[in-house]
Design a protein with these regions (language model features):
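Short, well-ordered beta-strand segments enriched in hydrophobic/aromatic residues
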Residues: 53-61
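Membrane engagement elements in two modes
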Residues: 1-52, 64-66, 71-74, 82-109, ...
Length: 150
């Protein structure tokens, strides 16, 4: 079972640490979204090729943001390309079954996982939000590509 406490996944009573890549941060206005990743060879196999990764995404709004900047996450999209060039696109409503609402100074953080058939893959991701002050106004937040390595 996977538990996560303060940035450290705990799996089978072992403590692991996420890799925080300073390049893998999306920023738009008052919104910052850093991504941290971790390869877990303990849950991976060579035959068949099955490489397990977990990741942590933190969505935060500056404490100095105006109240009308409050938003809700509506939609997520990601495109995963493995080392052989195979591509998979996934999209859905919310993230991990939730539609977080974030306002000034607030943080929403979630942990998820993925498996790949090659030792490295890269992911392109974006989220779509709507602002409460103007329901018709939305924002697309794109992430830099981030790479998964075993």
């Amino acid at each position: 079972m996977l538990y996560c406490r303060e940035g450290f996944p705990i799996i089978r009573d072992q403590i692991f640490r996420y890799v925080h890549d300073p390049v893998c941060v999306a920023m738009t206005g008052d919104i910052t979204v850093p991504v941290s990743t971790l390869s877990l060879p303990e849950f991976s196999s060579l035959h068949p090729s099955h490489y397990f990764f977990t990741y942590q995404i933190r969505i935060e709004m500056s404490k100095d943001a105006l109240p009308e900047k409050a938003f809700q996450l509506d939609h997520c999209y990601w495109r995963i390309t493995n080392a052989e060039g195979d591509m998979e696109e996934v999209q859905g409503s919310g993230v991990v079954g939730e539609f977080p609402v974030i306002s000034s100074g607030q943080i929403y953080e979630y942990t998820s996982c993925s498996t790949f058939s090659t030792t490295s893959s890269y992911m392109k991701r974006y989220y779509t939000f709507h602002f409460f002050a103007s329901r018709a106004r939305s924002l697309m937040l794109s992430f830099p590509d981030y790479i998964w390595h075993v």
